Amino acid sequence: MLHTLSVSPWHADIAAMLRLMEHGDDLVLLSDGVTAAIADGRFLEILQSAPITLYVLQDDVDARGLAGQIADSVGRVSYTDFVRLTVKHAGQLAW
């Protein structure tokens, strides 16, 4: 399953999202959701404990001036990569 988080993690039900995530799922953080990937942040630790692969949309990171603050452990994807992830997964859940 491909999960996308496009709102600030402070405005999302992260607990519900984690309950629905399974091994092999991917999560792409977009729009204000990219703030969840800030290094040493509360939400980064929570998301990294899930059995998923975590990505940020690089254009949204750049638009918010956060390029130097995103954890190195989080994958960066372009719009083309995002489309590839969409094709990879049969379903998608938007948060």
UniProtKB/Swiss-Prot annotation:
Gene3D superfamilies associated with the record: DsrEFH-like (3.40.1260.10)
Locations listed in the record: Cytoplasm
GO CC entries: sulfurtransferase complex
Gene Ontology biological process terms from the UniProt entry: tRNA wobble position uridine thiolation
NCBIfam families given in the database record: PRK13510.1 (NF010035), sulf_tusB_dsrH (TIGR03011)
Similarity comment: family membership: Belongs to the DsrH/TusB family.
Protein name: Protein TusB
